[in-house]
């Protein structure tokens, strides 16, 4: 995933330094070339040997270390780096970066880097909220560095508040955002729908379906990592919302209709991957329905057809993509839906095909356009997402 990419991890003195070992390991598993720089104070919290073992590269601390192959080390690393993450970033290191001080290996190297720089502050709440620290962070942002907001919680000093470094998985996502994909969708605005909806029968029960949201979330995440401005409208899904998207949670088909129709006009593309209820109970009981002898009938009524509305109101410059989950006559039914709903493309899959459908991490789909059909082999949902986005925006691989 990150083969050929060089990631520079800069670790300063903080109790959170140990978390970077997990991040370094995760990056190596993704085939990145990982280099670690440490301040002297950081070595009091974690041994450089740990990073050398995990990355296979020498961990640099001293600008004038004589035990390395001859090269101007801080310059050669700065040239090679595709992205730099300073984490944990102490108040002292942030001050150095803001004002261009270069008195150690870490600060010197970061100053020489021209690639994207990310800073993850970690310190006591009072230090973080100090106006001087806040001004320094604003200066860093002014010079193009991205600052990750610290989490709030119980701190090592015993205080509770802002100042915790986010978990390694969060830091990894920031790195992936910078280097995993080309930013070939930068400037594009995309609306994605995902997950199921729920239609209440009474305060206890509801009608829903087996959608987990995985496919829609994969599309939203991939589009965001490729630089798009993504709005994700989602029903109650079984997965965590991806980072870097505008997340709009909804519950019912009516909620989703309102959320989508109020936002669709400004979008370059709308990708409707949600499994929206076609029917809802006509009457919702205000109290729990009690079990009785004999059968019970629930009168249903149609919900608003979101995809039909989008097709009727679509701008000429807007791309509208729907999904079709079938159990039989997949191509015929999907072609009919493409035409009836005025879609530019429909992504069809058959629930009965192994590796496709709800809850899986893979999918088997056919992308259908008016004069073109592209059948994809079984792929991860992230790979399917990439193929869908390529087709929508005419990107050839």
Predicted feature locations:
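A cross-family phosphate/adenosyl-ligand binding-site feature
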Residues: 1-118, 124-213, 217-397
